[in-house]
Amino acid sequence: MLKLFKRIGRKKDSKIEDFYEFGPEIGRGAFSIVRQGTHKDTGDQVAIKAISKQHVSEADMKRFTREIEIMKKLKHKNIIQLIEVFDSNDYLYLVLELIRGGELFDKIVEKGNYSEKDACNLVRQIVSAVEYMHQHGVCHRDLKPENLLCSGDDEKEEIVRIADFGLSKIFEGGEELKTACGTPDYVAPEILECKPYDTSVDMWSIGVITYILLCGFAPFYADTHHELFQKILDLEYDFPEPEWNGITDLAKDFISQLLIINPEERWTASQCIKHPWLAENHGDKELKSLDSAISSMKDYVRNREASTSNILKMRASQSTPNLHSANSNTNTNSLSSSNSNNTTSNSNNNNNNNSNNSNNNNNNSNNNNNINNNNNNNNNNNNNNNNNNNNI
């Protein structure tokens, strides 16, 4: 891996072509193209994201600038690394660490052999990175499986990288955030209620991610966004059989400490690191093989690849959160050399087994659309929840 990372912030007149060879395209977004690149002197492989200045608004450019400032602050083994930035008249170039393993769910499905112990190791890495972000004044605000990339070549232990800081925010001590943003299946209840919030929203998302990693489907699911949001606000979830049979009580307790309506009672990342489920050294202790979770993840990946995603913006109200379509500028997204990231956006379908008939694979689809607060008045509460998660 490239050594961290001395070159951030080239002079404006530096030309990227003097330092990097451009390779094949590995991703594309509304305003950007991502190519694999090679450093001319060192031979290091990188991902180069070229953002066209001609096609972005002043507000978008401010957002990209904010994202760059955030990524410059973060140097952690479980966070994708920004190497350097080039600024030309027509393009803003972000040179990033190249992640070869693709999205985490894809890697789990490909591997085929997956246990609760593996899930625990993955969650431990995520919590470690989020603890670091929060200690450095960064709230991610859009943690979800699609923003977790896998870079480990060692089959014994996958290395998770958190990506996509397009919705992230630097906050000062005691500051409260107000912008309604996130992805429906993973969004915290205080955001849906338009209440001020803090980094605890990331911890709610980790609770949802942990749940999915252990069973393959989301804790909250419904046919419409309105119903989905109401289930989140009512904390309407359980651990249905047979998917949760054999999974340890410690794992369930860990999730229960995060899926708490009151953010003041929700565990912090520092508390989670010390939770027995993460802190305990499992050693060679056998934990349940999560074959059913892999099966559900296969459906998740297959349905995502078969769909085309929208970006949705949310207008949340205290009583009835509403979702409506809007033309939107995508987040700066995950960079990976895997084929799963070669589309502009992917729909990710969380297939959820109804607890009233656990052996029946009639799954409800939950739509994970990126949501940002706006003032449009078009309500789409009757849209089906097909998981729309954007990756460039």
From Swiss-Prot:
Annotated transmembrane regions: none
Reaction catalysed? Answer: L-seryl-[myosin light chain] + ATP = O-phospho-L-seryl-[myosin light chain] + ADP + H(+); L-threonyl-[myosin light chain] + ATP = O-phospho-L-threonyl-[myosin light chain] + ADP + H(+)
According to its UniProt record, the EC number is: 2.7.11.18
* One GO biological process term: signal transduction
Which stretches does UniProt call biased (Polar residues)?
317-326
Q: What is this protein called?
A: Probable myosin light chain kinase DDB_G0271550
Q: Does the keyword Kinase apply?
A: yes
Q: Where is the composition biased (Low complexity)?
A: 327-392
Task: Relate the protein's function as given in its record.
Answer: May phosphorylate a specific serine in the N-terminus of a myosin light chain.
Q: Where is the Protein kinase domain?
A: 20-278
* The keyword RNA-binding is annotated on this UniProt entry: no
- Note the SS bond partners: none
Family, according to the entry, reads as follows: Belongs to the protein kinase superfamily. CAMK Ser/Thr protein kinase family. CaMK subfamily.
MF terms (GO), sorted A to Z = ATP binding; myosin light chain kinase activity; protein serine/threonine kinase activity
Report the Pfam families cross-referenced here: Pkinase
What organism is recorded for this protein?
Answer: Dictyostelium discoideum (Social amoeba)
Binding-site residues, ATP: 26-34, 49
So where's the catalytic machinery, residue-wise? 142
